């Protein structure tokens, strides 16, 4: 059995929203930047391909598909700001921590009129025998945590407006792969005839915020002092987020992910992307 990659330093589920303080960990006296990049790229085919394309991956076509994926990312309008990288990180975290299933391929989120789902950085589901829970993700891949909080709360408030939500549900429904095993259940949930009250009762928003952490840069291994200090940092940020959010109609799972520096992680991700493009 494959062990989890991410270290959950702190998990507080007795507050709203709940808190997950997540860390990539350390190895050989260094923050596990390179290991994180390798792990994220394990998810890249699943993140970028439709369900049907992913299911058809074979030893014969996988290299061609990887080239297709990397070309799609480079052509994305989000690439200049590395938005795709934050979305990939969110994808990996919620897949690992909550065993979510991706419902939509992010690379197929077009920016043209009538087919935009800019509002959601991830569209996943959690499936049980009786229910299908919709996970609509938001991520701010930032170096400044307080700027991240300010920007994400502005978007969260926009994304629960009725007209906005209905438009986004239409865009999502149009991109659900008919071969995906849960397609019918999700389309029924998002149908205009389904009350938004019922939809919202089965919907949560995972929010991922990254930031350059002064605590993280002080340590080169996981120790009691690091756990205590980073936990205090997580708790302080969580309180700031909660105070600014106020009352909110949907369940939120807040994921905080400290970085040594955002720029060095972005450079490593881009280098890996270029290597994959040359395969």
Model-predicted segments: where are they?
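A structured, charge-rich N-terminal accessory region that forms the first stable segment of a protein
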Residues: 1-66
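A short, highly charged nucleic-acid-interacting micro-segment common to nuclease
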Residues: 70-89
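Conserved catalytic cores of phosphodiester-cleaving nucleases, focusing on short active-site segments
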Residues: 94, 121-124, 134-141
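A short acidic/basic microdomain associated with nuclease active sites
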Residues: 98-114
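A short, glycine/Asx- and small/polar-enriched loop/turn
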Residues: 115-119
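Active-site ExK catalytic segment of metal-dependent nucleases
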Residues: 133-159
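Acidic, metal/cofactor-coordinating or nucleic-acid-engaging core segments within structured domains
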Residues: 150-228
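Extended, charged low-complexity segments
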Residues: 221-279
């Amino acid at each position: 059995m494959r062990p989890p990659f991410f270290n959950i330093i702190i998990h507080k589920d007795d507050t709203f929203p709940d808190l997950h303080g997540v860390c990539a960990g350390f190895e050989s006296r260094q923050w596990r930047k390179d290991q994180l990049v390798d792990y994220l790229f394990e998810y890249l085919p699943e993140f970028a391909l439709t369900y049907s394309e992913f299911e058809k991956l074979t030893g014969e076509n996988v290299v061609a598909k990887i080239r297709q994926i990397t070309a799609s990312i480079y052509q994305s309008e989000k690439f200049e700001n590395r938005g795709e990288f934050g979305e990939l990180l969110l994808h990996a975290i919620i897949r690992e921590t909550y065993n979510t299933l991706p419902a939509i391929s992010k690379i197929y989120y077009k920016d043209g009129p009538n087919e935009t789902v800019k509002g959601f950085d991830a569209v996943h589901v959690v499936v049980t025998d009786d229910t299908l829970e919709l996970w609509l993700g938001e991520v701010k891949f930032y170096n400044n945590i307080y700027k991240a909080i300010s920007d994400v709360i502005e978007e969260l408030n926009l994304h629960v407006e009725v007209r906005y939500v209905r438009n986004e549900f239409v865009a999502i429904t149009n991109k659900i792969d008919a071969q995906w095993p849960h397609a019918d259940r999700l389309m029924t949930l998002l149908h205009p005839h389904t009350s938004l009250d019922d939809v919202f009762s089965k919907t949560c928003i995972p929010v991922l915020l990254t930031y350059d952490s002064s605590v993280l840069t002080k340590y080169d291994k996981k120790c009691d002092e690091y756990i205590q200090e980073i936990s205090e940092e997580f708790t302080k940020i969580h309180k700031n987020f909660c105070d600014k959010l106020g009352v909110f109609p949907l369940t939120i799972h807040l994921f905080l992910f400290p970085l040594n520096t955002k720029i060095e992680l972005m450079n490593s991700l881009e280098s890996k992307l270029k290597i994959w493009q040359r395969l």
